[in-house]
């Protein structure tokens, strides 16, 4: 019976298994109904000066009877270690558990609602400072695109700065009065005015040359009048023979009158 009592687990509350409430000698000695009546703390490496930064362990030995009986008679005892399941950084309240992110801060049980303290990883901003010479390293495939976009932005900013934001109303009215072409662009009035001035000069030159044309026409008429007598007589013979011969061609009188009026040939009838 004595060995069974020694090997039986300690009767401790179930919420102490999470390690949020540390065990003390007063709490263990106050439970008279339990089979363990004495508690003896064993010094560990943490008490000797070697302290682990992440976890700390404390060993407790439980033996039946008082402390005197345990010292006098060596009896088998059960030793177990209670390791805190939380990280301790020197704060008064325990930190969150790694396995259970949503844990009650005071009772050590998994809460039904999410905790206010987030356990996700913190996004650290990248180092935005450039090198001393101001160079920025980019991907080789994106270099040309970046340069092209920078040039287009610089060009757009330059145009927006040079252009005046307001145009006077008189300039707008003047633009509305200017003649436009089929495409909507303004016509060049200087070339149109030059074309208009060239047309009267051409007409004057043609008028100047009219007397010369008259002299040329008169010389042509003189040349036509100076035909040889033989040609005239031959024509007279041809006309007379064709007009009076019964089988020959008869030339109408109207044609003769028209030919005489034109002056292409002068006939002596």
Curated annotation (Swiss-Prot):
Keyword entries, A-Z: Activator, DNA-binding, Nucleus, Transcription, Transcription regulation
Annotated DNA-binding residue span(s): 164-189
Full protein name: Nuclear transcription factor Y subunit A-10
InterPro entries on file: CCAAT-binding_factor_CS, NFYA
GN (gene name): NFYA10
Predominant cellular place of this UniProt entry's protein: nucleus
Listed Basic residues bias regions: 168-180
Superkingdom to which the source organism belongs: Eukaryota
Cellular compartments annotated: Nucleus
Motif mapping: Subunit association domain (SAD): 137-158
Biased composition (Polar residues): 198-207, 214-227
Region (Disordered): 168-227
Gene Ontology terms: cellular component: CCAAT-binding factor complex
GO terms, molecular function: DNA binding; DNA-binding transcription factor activity
Protein's job: Stimulates the transcription of various genes by recognizing and binding to a CCAAT motif in promoters.
PROSITE patterns, A to Z: NFYA_HAP2_1 (PS00686), NFYA_HAP2_2 (PS51152)
Gene3D superfamilies linked: 6.10.250.2430
């Amino acid at each position: 019976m004595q060995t069974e009592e020694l090997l039986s687990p300690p009767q401790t509350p179930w919420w102490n298994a999470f390690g949020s409430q540390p065990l003390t000698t007063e709490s263990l000695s106050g439970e008279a109904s339990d089979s363990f009546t004495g508690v003896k703390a064993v010094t560990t490496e943490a008490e000797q000066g070697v302290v682990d930064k992440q976890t700390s362990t404390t060993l407790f030995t439980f033996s039946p009877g008082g402390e005197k009986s345990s010292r006098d008679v060596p009896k088998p005892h059960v030793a177990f270690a209670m390791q805190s399941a939380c990280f301790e950084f020197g704060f008064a309240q325990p930190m969150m558990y790694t396995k259970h992110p949503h844990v009650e801060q005071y009772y050590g049980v998994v809460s039904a609602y999410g905790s206010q303290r987030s356990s996700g990883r913190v996004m650290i901003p990248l180092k935005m400072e450039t090198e001393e010479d101001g160079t920025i390293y980019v991907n080789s495939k994106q270099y040309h695109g970046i340069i092209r976009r920078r040039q287009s932005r610089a060009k757009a900013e330059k145009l927006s700065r040079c252009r005046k934001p307001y145009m006077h109303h008189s300039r707008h009215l003047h633009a509305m009065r200017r003649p436009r072409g089929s495409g909507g662009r303004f016509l060049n009035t200087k070339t149109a005015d030059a074309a208009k001035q060239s047309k009267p000069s051409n007409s004057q030159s043609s008028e100047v040359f009219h007397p010369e044309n008259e002299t040329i026409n008169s010389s042509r008429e003189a040349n036509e009048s100076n035909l040889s007598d033989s040609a005239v007589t031959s024509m007279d013979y041809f006309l007379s023979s064709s007009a009076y011969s019964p089988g020959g061609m008869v030339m109408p009188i109207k044609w003769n009158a028209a030919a005489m009026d034109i002056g292409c040939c002068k006939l002596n009838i």
